Amino acid sequence: FIGMIPGLIGGLISAIK
């Protein structure tokens, strides 16, 4: 779960950009 958080954040940033 902990390692999953950075992936979600990175995905959101990539989606926004």
From Swiss-Prot:
GO terms for cellular component: extracellular region. The modification Lysine amide is found at residue 17. Expressed by the venom gland. The keyword Protein transport does not apply. Its main location: secreted. It is found in: Secreted. GO terms for biological process: defense response to bacterium; defense response to fungus; innate immune response; killing of cells of another organism. Keywords: Amidation, Antibiotic, Antimicrobial, Fungicide, Immunity, Innate immunity, Secreted. Antimicrobial peptide. Is able to kill Mycobacterium abscessus subsp. massiliense in a dose-dependent manner. Has antifungal activity against Candida spp. and one Cryptococcus neoformans strains with MICs values ranging from 12.5 to 100 uM. Shows low cytotoxic activity and low hemolytic activity on human erythrocytes. Shows anti-inflammatory activities, since it decreases release of pro-inflammatory cytokines, and increases release of anti-inflammatory cytokines. Acts by blocking the Toll-like receptor 4 (TLR4). Belongs to the non-disulfide-bridged peptide (NDBP) superfamily. Short antimicrobial peptide (group 4) family. Negative results: does not show antifungal activity against Candida glabrata (ATCC90030) (MIC>400 uM). This is Antimicrobial peptide ToAP3. It comes from Tityus obscurus.
